[in-house]
């Protein structure tokens, strides 16, 4: 697989809308790996289509498998045999590190956006993005992929652990990847939901009269 496709995968996966990343596969229960896979392949497809069209050839994958996406992305003038196995391996590196966050950082509130750790969670995301870009510039793609997996886990946990959707938001929270923008309407530890196991509290009205963002 060419380094160009690796750059596409690494550079643009984080640009996938975070809410899009939570579309279940096959109508079943979403896991971190299924969410990550859906988001990455969707973004790679979108990006490869744009790159192919800019190069003057059609992007017409014969299917949605990683192998078929790789062949369509590289185009008809690609030399040699296209390796879907290498693409699979690159994706697996991301999936593995994504899943290991639950094992290696099980008690870290910022890694999972628990206990109102908004600022710490965003810091992990933004610092991770800086590290990803730096590793891409150095062509250290494996390190970039591994960091991407970890960052995506924390980003996913924001949407699954917070009341973002319950508050009526349908767009990604861009402030999570923009350290120059403030995180607004945040609940503190003393104002968070007193019964977080009970998800039947619409917008947590007793605890959040001003519709504060909480976990």
Each predicted region: which residue ranges?
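Cleavable N-terminal signal peptides of Sec/SRP-targeted secreted and luminal proteins
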Residues: 3-17
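N-terminal, motif-rich segments that launch catalysis or mediate targeting to/interaction with membranes
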Residues: 15-149, 154-157, 161-215
